[in-house]
């Protein structure tokens, strides 16, 4: 979009597991931007089909016939090691393998793609949606992540933004964004809980809001609990029921599984509004006796029973979040429901039980996070005044000390930005160096927490054990990404690192992916233009052949031959895989000759009218009401081939043309 000027807007993007959404501030209000397909959310799906890369709705449409090359729910893999995703691998039809550094990566047609690259494709789609609406090139964004994402996952999300060509001004938690959207116009002090059950993750955040200050008091959650898991229990139920009925196991049939996935998602959504739903999947498989059809009825009560253990998993994080905030349920003034799964009646009932009040359903759970991200973009861009956001880190940070113990420096739910320092010493006499192992988690032993970085402080002057003073400092920015330093107080020697995601990408890898994305963007654009031109040519052939068939008796034979020649020209260009310019040229030529059909018929109609007028005195007296029953249509037939558009031969002369 180089022809556009650079926009000053900072867009807000909710990069969701199932769907994504983009919003922007306009006239002091956050506006959700509709995609080119006319939807306010876009499926977070990327598919590879031949040389084509599909993103969003087109990718979702072809998933049933191309499951192994259709990548959905990839957010569950971002910033994670292959060794950490065994259970997630079981639920997806595509290939997940181990990358060069042990990261989880996807393999399609022998080529590896990182979750960051796939996330970047979705972000690029969001960027293009915003650019099409604003008419300007967008370069800056606020992107949301689950509140309980660790540092690796946050940093990897930021990398995805860079690959998409975005300067990510801030990474903010989804519940915090939702609270911004809810509270931006509220007066007075309130304590609110944001219950966010989305497609792949669950978060609960407790906030205090008032006078433009949004302070996160605590956050908790489960990054492995979401709508995908609710789909999965329905899929397993369908597989078991079908096996009982037909003796056939559908669990190894990827194409059938994709159909079951779509059916489960549809049933889940329907059961939020009705007490039972029919699941019909004809020709789901076949055996020696012929095709088999799946036809089942799922009631809301059955679904709630299947999903009971999943709903139960939301309770503990809520209780912990209240405890960390030093509040009880009765202290909460309002509970916001966020994420598509929060529409499930049993989930809403659980929220009511936990907090002792009806949850607030006044926000759109699919859009509120993107709206909040846009508001934060407005704050950073100076468009929104008098708003201060005080967020927290979701997990404790510390280092490994003697005995394999994790010593915590920054407790979870500490408000950020923040800086914490602590003095440590050596464990042996004349120890020349120390290795600082940086950890994230809540377990007492280092091995049970996530290692997110390590570095060495060397050249420590010889001294008895316990004498050297090593100052370790944690400096955490507003994005929740941090720097760690270690300094020998006596010598002043210091070593520091910016904690990059341990499952993240190196700078050279990011730069390569940025270049690849830009190159692919141009190639994708050319492929799309080629596809559009071929589709238009094919459609023009169909319309021309139909017009000849319908109007052959009413247009000159010379015109029929001219059109038939040009139909052949277009057909040959398609068959020979001619350059796009050539295909466009012959298609345009055919289109111009198609217009001559209407011109010819209008000419004939005018001649007939003139003839009728000349003979009006001696001609028969025709009732105009009878004439209307035998009207000519000079418009070309519609693409649907409806017989209503065909010309009828008039069995009367037209004597009056004024009613046209």
Curated annotation (Swiss-Prot):
Annotated stretches, region: Disordered: 591-660
Biased composition (Low complexity): 600-614
Residue positions, PTM Phosphothreonine: 201
Domain of life: Bacteria
Compositionally skewed regions (Polar residues) per UniProt: 633-642
GO cellular component, one term: symbiont-containing vacuole
GO molecular function term, any single one: unfolded protein binding
Biased composition (Acidic residues): 646-660
Induction: By stress conditions e.g. heat shock.
Keyword annotations from UniProtKB, A to Z: ATP-binding, Chaperone, Nucleotide-binding, Phosphoprotein, Stress response
Function text: Acts as a chaperone.
Note: Expressed early during infection.
Family: Belongs to the heat shock protein 70 family.
Protein name, as recorded: Chaperone protein DnaK
Source species of the chain: Chlamydia pneumoniae (Chlamydophila pneumoniae)
Gene: dnaK
